[in-house]
A protein has these predicted regions:
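Conserved alpha/beta-hydrolase
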Residues: 155-175
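Short alpha-helix in the alpha/beta-hydrolase fold that links the catalytic acid
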Residues: 151, 294, 308-317
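Hydrolase active-site cap/lid region
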Residues: 223-278
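An N-terminal hydrophobic leader/cap segment in hydrolases
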Residues: 44, 55-112, 123
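Alpha/beta-hydrolase active-site loop
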Residues: 179-200
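Acidic catalytic loop of the alpha/beta-hydrolase fold
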Residues: 303-307, 335
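Short beta-strand/loop motif that positions the catalytic acidic residue
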Residues: 292-293, 298-300, 304
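The serine-hydrolase catalytic nucleophile loop
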Residues: 141-154
């Protein structure tokens, strides 16, 4: 009995030791599992941080690239020989007219010093029968005044207007380091209307001014239209302008790079505000048009996919005060309405200004 009891006790001790060993194994396994999970979580955390950091760096890099791509001026923007060559290629009959204007001293250059201290350039010429009627003509993105002399000829030769054709900031012979998409340009054009009034005011008829812009020049014109202006600025004509810098850049981001608006549009707009003092959303011709109370003529080609045709209806609808007119040029691509319909363009502008 004593032996059996002793043996039974040994068995119990043995079982207890085995249970302890099993429990130790379970504990070690659990501890190892916790260590493995901690390692995996730590690694996942590091990978997540790395991915976030890469995303942020890529977004910043993309924003810097997009801003430079969009707002850096043409490095050859002062090369007027190339500019005139392009003008004559598209409008061969312009060369004799330009040569005559230059030879006789009618086509002149002038400069204004802007509040920033930068000197801006413009071409100007008068019409003997103008009676104070003057057109301030605004060119497009990465273009210059000389390339739009076809429009200057229309106003001067066909409509009898004095003409002022500014080079926008960082375009043509105007100083500057960045393209302003028409936003800050609106205030520069306001200065040019003041110059035009001083230069061409008639002693009998006074002066009245139409501001006419194409593409980015049209966006500039619409942006100007919402400002407080002297009474002598009487009419506006916008040819294929965009609703806002945001909308136009979003269209090009998708068309050229197949990218959505988020996140680049948001970060690049913020960067633009930091670097240049304005944001893509702030540059909003459509909001300015909503404040315009003077007559405006809207022109757009229905085959325009650079500044999409649907934007015309949006800016037209936004103008709820004062007279307005619309002309859709059939089959016309971006900024080509005059080239496709020169006679009708001239007559429609004449009719609008006469109303």
């Amino acid at each position: 009995m004593i032996f059996r009891s002793f043996a039974l006790s040994l068995n119990k001790i043995s079982c207890t030791r085995k249970n302890i060993q099993v429990n130790l194994l379970i504990f070690r396994s659990f501890a190892l599992s916790l260590q493995t999970k901690a390692y995996i979580m730590k690694k996942t955390y590091r990978i997540t941080l790395a991915v976030i950091a890469l995303f942020i760096l890529a977004t910043i890099g993309g924003s810097v690239y997009m801003l430079n791509f969009s707002l850096s001026p043409d490095p050859n923007h002062t090369d007027l020989d190339s500019t005139y060559a392009i003008l004559y290629k598209h409008f061969p009959d312009m060369k004799p007219w330009v040569d005559s204007m230059q030879t006789n001293g009618y086509l002149r250059d002038t400069f204004l010093t802007m509040p920033t201290g930068e000197r801006h350039h413009a071409l100007y010429f008068r019409a003997d029968s103008a009676k104070g009627r003057t057109a301030v003509l605004v060119h497009g993105y990465k273009d210059c005044a000389a390339k739009f002399l076809y429009l200057g000829r229309m106003y001067n030769r066909d409509l009898g207007y004095n003409v002022v054709m500014p080079d926008l900031h960082a375009h043509g012979l105007s100083e500057g380091n960045d393209i302003q998409m028409g936003w800050k340009d609106r205030l520069d054009i306001k200065r040019w209307t003041e110059m035009a009034a001083e230069t061409f005011r008639d002693s009998v008829y006074g002066v009245n001014i139409v501001v006419h812009g194409v593409s980015m020049g049209a966006a500039t014109t619409m942006s100007l239209s919402g400002e407080e202006l002297p009474a002598y600025v009487t009419h506006f004509i916008e040819d294929c302008g965009y609703t806002s810098a945001w909308d136009e850049f979003a269209v090009q981001l998708k068309a050229q790079f197949s990218l959505p608006q988020f996140p680049l549009m948001y970060t690049t707009s913020l960067l633009c505000r930091i670097v240049h003092g304005w944001s893509f959303g702030e540059c909003s011709p459509i909001k300015q048009v909503a404040k315009c109370q003077r007559p405006m003529f809207f022109i757009h080609g229905d085959a325009d996919d650079f500044v999409p045709f649907y934007m015309m209806q949006q800016v037209y609808d936004a103008k709820t005060h004062g007279k307005k007119a619309m002309w859709v040029t059939k089959g016309t691509t971006h900024a080509s309405s005059y080239a496709d319909y020169p006679k009708e363009y001239t007559e429609r502008v004449r009719q609008f200004l006469a109303e």
